[in-house]
Amino acid sequence: MMDQQKKRFFFNNRRFLSLFSAKRSCIFVLHSAVKELELALMKLRPANKMMYMRTFVVALILFVLAAGELKAQGWQFNFGGSKEDEGWAVLQTEDEGFIVVGFGESFGTDNDQNIFVVRTDIDGTILWTKYYDEGFQEQARSIIPTADGNYLIVGNIIGKPGERENIYLLKIDRKGGLLWSKQFGGAGNERANDVVLDSDGGFSVIGTSKNATEEDENILLVKFDAEGTATWSKTYGTPRKDEGKSITRIGEGYALLGNSRNETGFDNNIVLYRVDKLGNIIWERRIANSFREEGRSIITTQDGGLAIAGVINDNSDALIVKYDANGNQRWMRSIGDANVEEEANAITELKDGSLVITGLKLVSSVNVDLLVAKVDAKGNILWEKAIGDGEFTEEGRDIQATKAGGYIITGYNGQLLNTFNDLILVKTDGAGNTITNRVNGQVFVDRDNQCDFDNGESPLSGWIVKATKGIDVVYGTTNAEGHYSILLDTGIYNLKVLPPNRYWSTCSTEGVNVRLREFYDSLNIDFGAKAAVNCPFMEVDITTPFLAQCSEVDYIVNYCNTGTVTAQNAYVDLALDNKLTFQSASLSAEQLADGKLRFRLGNVAANGCGSFTVKTALDCNGVANGQTGLVSARVFPDTFCLDLDPRWDRSSIVVRGICKKDTVIFEIQNIGKGDMKERKKGIVVQDDIIMRGVNPTYQLQSGKSIEVAIPNPNGSTFRLFAEQSEGHPGRSLPTVAVEGCAEDGKPIITGQVTQFPENDQDPFVSIDIQEILSAVQSVALRGHPKGYGKQSTIDAKTDLTFTVIFQNSGSDTVQRVVIRDTLSQAIDPTTVIPGSSSHPYFLEVYEGGIVKITFDSINLLPANGGTAQKTYGFVEFRASQKPNNPTGTVIDNRATVYFDYRLPSGTNTVRWRIDHFPDFVRVLTSSQEVFVPGVKVDIYPNPFSEMVTLEVKGRQYNRLQLNVYDLSGKLIQQKFFNSNICHVYRDQLAAGIYSYQLISEGQLINTGKLIVR
């Protein structure tokens, strides 16, 4: 008997697919580890993200970044080939990525339908794709995570053309490996539509059972154990056609959603059963208010009730119905415009009790869009969105709320008048918005000065393309082939390419204006660049993950030439800390007379990069935890090829510092070719206090120098800052620190050196300075400089360096590591510069300033199965602050590390507060400052452990007041004395540096500092 149910006809609807194929004798799993297949799976239409799966050391791969508040955040990917591919169910995985199941026939070997599974990371980057083929036709309908961390796929299978249909069960691991497959069926046809995990580790499947000899179909419920063996089954229904659509757990039993053919035989009614854990009916409810009602999806809500999504009315409105646990209907809501068909296929609940559906909306007779709509907990419609391209049909099959507050949707789309569909994965924000317009293009060396891209013209990688619309700014970066791709909202944008330095010029200095009128638009804009100055521009970076006493330390040195011509005979000079001993290097090293090591790089082409490793050993003796180790690298040529500032007098200041017995000696030297025309000043900081009386001024002739001597350093850390003359090229900040200068056996103060930046603001200089640690966390974030004092204060012009350290603390080798770091709003994402790393990686910056770093094929051994070097990894990147950050701005930063498919691990948080240097540094003398003529104050011992004595000489006082402050200026002690000798006990003072004031009769006598051990 012909099914008389009403149909809607779409030219590309899946219902018209027919298949003819031979049977395969064994299950076939196609795993698209080959990147070409992964690219083929992604239909590169405007809604798709371009994927470049390469592993270049310090290679900037395609990224999308939104610096302003865009109207929509999200993406849409299409997976498929030239035949039928559809998505039916989606999950967000524990690593915050996604796994999608459905069916496809584009990439199998026998032209039939197979189960199709795609796993992506949080940004939609394909991790793997697989096909599962055990017969003539296989289709997946649902997927759930199992208790052991794997996944169960439930669907249907037909072994041979004309054979009956069975329920098909597959269990796969996190990498898509097949653990087992099983079938369930009898003499008739059994089909599955949904599955739910049970508390005993097993699972229950809902579907339909059709009698072999009759047309009657019933709702089928099957209980399976954890290994896929059926323990019992039951059917429910009427003498007419009944179909089981969705299942959810409620209490100790289940709620079953199905459709039952009404008495007219033309349309369905919705049927809802609540059953106990053995399948016995507790209550039954029906919705039969109009000619047509269909249930598609059911969930258990936070209040213990049930929510249903489906279709109502002949003209098809989307339907949401809310029940309590006893089957009492709380409310019913239909969503639909007059004369516009809408259907709901899936539903999800948010933390506030609101509900979101997905399905389809018939925009016109030839255009169907994906529907997303939200209602509050009482059923009031909050918003409704239609996502789709006028040239394509899109339908949402499943929806889940994401941890980020948006939604992930799967389904299918297909082009108008095209029989075949593609699986789609759509990510939206919390309002159902997504970005679908894309601007692509090429950035290249314009050798013929025609400003259009010709074959043979060299691509430029790592260049930033900026798109501006009002206050909204979006960025893209070119990949290794010079290609960029940016997702944009609608509107008028100015696109401009930003050269990495001033040695380059571009064809379009003012940019190109583009108008994006509609969604799913696509434009191609190429940018040519040429040399403004023929000069190399060398950059260098050196890093190691951490320093540990008496250990091997491997430094990674990266270098690049972002200039316009080849750097001839380039080399890197390396200076090691005296606590480090050179062992070997992956590049031949020359020992220089001054103790430095020289590594010859040869010729480095424009836009070329490279790296090498330097192995060292850190001393076992005479090294304290918290003490620093410093290594500096300088790459040559370091030529400055632009016009010089006319104010510059050709002087160039360098500073040096040494500990000589009981004295710290700083040297300031002019190594430039010109004499200084103006006097400049230096600042000396002892630990974290600016000294008075020793800060030098200088006006040096070429080659001349001065010394600054500081006696009796008492183990403190001293740092000198010096100024360059006005107009000095580059960003040089002459500074040097001397740490641990004390008599043998005397204690030293550590932890002070890294609070200030080093002189490596110029790209051709890199300084790695770290505190020696006794232990390292399995994931850690290090920020440099760490900032001054308890508030970690830095200047508004200080660049920040971030190093992420990670160790494989699991029991299995890790193949892939991803780091995601959401930058503070005070950091300029466009200034992110990738640095050294333990392994090859690629870096992306996108959305509101998320830095994503991916290590593919890292092969990181478990901590208990290899040496530290093979269990740890690290990566460094640098970024500048946004201009004019106001005083008081707080910069917080924290990274998340993803090891393969595990739960992500968060690092510590690093924090800074912005102020103006040197205003935020307390200003005191090296020991004290006396404000009363003829008075002297002796302090002994200082530093002290239990008690310190302050003895006033030169004048008799009857009463003295002593105020003790911490470094933030907070008064923490106040004491009074009736003689000129003041004994101050440590009491509860923690180790550290404190300032004090000595006062008598309202007059300030003396200020200074106390050092507590």
Which residue ranges define each predicted feature?
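C-terminal outer-membrane/trafficking sorting elements
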Residues: M1-D3, C26, H31, E38-L39, ...
